Amino acid sequence: MMFRGFLRWCAARPEYREMTDRDAGKAAAIVENLPSNTRRTDALEAAQVPGWWAGVEQLSNRTASAYLRALLLTGARREELAALTWANVDFQWRKLTLADKVETTRTIPLSPYMAQMLAALPKAGPFVFASTGKAGRITDTRASHAKALQSAAIVGLTIHGLRRSFSLLGEAAGAPAGAIAQVMGHKPSAT
């Protein structure tokens, strides 16, 4: 839960440690008034991918279509991919450099399909997934995603569920869990 996560973050910082009661988030008065701490499990099953893919390809917004497919193909977080600039796409050496959520970057492979898909996008500014909106880049594709889900008769798949799908489908295909985690930007595990 975000509140408990924030308390743990504060407790880990020397400048906030003395002001923080790490167990405050476990108090009954707080726990009773916050939503349950359940883990989301939405992800595409292998058999659902063709229908979802076809639904996404039919979207009239070509940028949203490419963005949604790229989320599934890379396992990237929404904002990492939305903020991708042309300067961070290396078509020659087939790699993408993503700015991740902890202010570092990671480089991932750019598949031939993905390279072709990105090259077909209009270069209307610095962002790969450009938009005419205030941000200059794609910001919310939930409506487009909902259309694709409806056409594929898939219920309950969130945008973040595409990230989970990347991981689960990669494991099902036999990719090593460590390689999947590295591409997704997860911290290395000691296990």
Model-found features: residue ranges?
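Active-site/catalytic core of tyrosine-dependent DNA strand-transfer enzymes
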Residues: A43-P50, W93, P109-V155
